[in-house]
C-alpha cells in the first residue's frame, strides 16, 4: 500500500438506521390508531429481519420514494398500528437479521394474540447484557407470562395488556437497548416508571429521548 500526503475532503450523508427506527415503529404498533412515517431509511435486506418478523405478525408497511444511494437502497417507511396483532413462531433462519432488535420484538409480542416462540437465540445473552434473561424478567415484571431457556423464549401475549402500577427498571449493566425498550413500554402500556441510566441510549441513538419528547412522550430526567 502506497501512502498519500494529502486526503481530499468529501460530504457523505449516512442513511437512517432501521434498528433505531424500530423503537418508534414499536411505539406506533402498541398505540391505538397511530401512524408513523420514517424518512430515508436504509432498507438493506441484511438489516430488515425485524420488519419481516413484524410482517408475519400482521403489521403492514408501505415503502415509498425508494432510491439507490452510495450502493444502498433507501426508502421512506409508513406504518400504522394494526387492528389485530398476531403471535409468531419465529423461524430460526430469521434470527441473524434481527438479533439486535429482539428485545423490542419481545415487547411487541407481549401484546399479540396467542403464544409467540423464539428459539436458537442464545447469542442474546452475550450482548451488552444477558438480554434474553433480562427480557424474560422484564416481561414477568409487567405481568406477561413467559417461559425461557438459555436459547429460547415463549411469550403468552395479552392484547389487552395495560399497566397502572409503579415500576422500576434498574438496567444495572447500562444496556442501551434495554433502556429504550423499557421507555417504549412505559410510554405505551401505562403505569408510573423509574428507569435508570438514560445516558446509555447515547451508545447507539443519541437523539432518542429528544425524538421521544418531540412526538409527545412525557418524562422527567433526574440527576443521580
For each feature predicted by the language model, list its residue ranges:
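Short, structured segments at the rim of ligand-binding sites
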Residues: 1-224
Amino acid at each position: 500500500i502506497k501512502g498519500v500526503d494529502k486526503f481530499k475532503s468529501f460530504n457523505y450523508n449516512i442513511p437512517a438506521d432501521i434498528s433505531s427506527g424500530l423503537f418508534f415503529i414499536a411505539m406506533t404498533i402498541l398505540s391505538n390508531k397511530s401512524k408513523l412515517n420514517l424518512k430515508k431509511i436504509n432498507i438493506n435486506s441484511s438489516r430488515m429481519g425485524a420488519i419481516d418478523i413484524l410482517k408475519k405478525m400482521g403489521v403492514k408497511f408501505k415503502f415509498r420514494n425508494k432510491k439507490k444511494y452510495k450502493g444502498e437502497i433507501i426508502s421512506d417507511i409508513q406504518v400504522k398500528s394494526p387492528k389485530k396483532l398476531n403471535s409468531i413462531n419465529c423461524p430460526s433462519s430469521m434470527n441473524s437479521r434481527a438479533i439486535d432488535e429482539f428485545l423490542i420484538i419481545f415487547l411487541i409480542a407481549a401484546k399479540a394474540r396467542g403464544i409467540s416462540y423464539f428459539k436458537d437465540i442464545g447469542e442474546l445473552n452475550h450482548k451488552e447484557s444477558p438480554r434474553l434473561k433480562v427480557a424474560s424478567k422484564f416481561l414477568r415484571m409487567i405481568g406477561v407470562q413467559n417461559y425461557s431457556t438459555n436459547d429460547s423464549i415463549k411469550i403468552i401475549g395479552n392484547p389487552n395488556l395495560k399497566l397502572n402500577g409503579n415500576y422500576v427498571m434498574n438496567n444495572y449493566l447500562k444496556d442501551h437497548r434495554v433502556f429504550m425498550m423499557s421507555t417504549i413500554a412505559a410510554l405505551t402500556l401505562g403505569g408510573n416508571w423509574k428507569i435508570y441510566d438514560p445516558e446509555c441510549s447515547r451508545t447507539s441513538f443519541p437523539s432518542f429521548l429528544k425524538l421521544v419528547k418531540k412526538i409527545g412522550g412525557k418524562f422527567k430526567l433526574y440527576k443521580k
